[in-house]
């Protein structure tokens, strides 16, 4: 899942800016795992957000009736500088990788700009509501 927290990506731009995030969520060793691939600059909030496995995001995976459900809750520091207030605007996208023997054999993406070159300006708008 990716976030353009300041909604400042341009459609023709490729690559992340210093306010963007990319998280990988999955199961490793039978346990849910969250890995931050890219995090925003600490210039916005003085909080370091290095890449790596993190425990801040609450993440659960459950299987029910042959279906798999993923649930995640991202605390404020994991999406900063996004302002968590009604009306705040960001861009986001989601990708589901199709894997076989540890290699990606395909993917499904919610919007363009996430499966290949990263292009936050192509992601969908998201508005926080009360």
Question: Which positions does each model-derived feature cover?
Answer:
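Structural preference for beta-rich elements and adjacent junctions enriched in aromatics
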Residues: 1-130
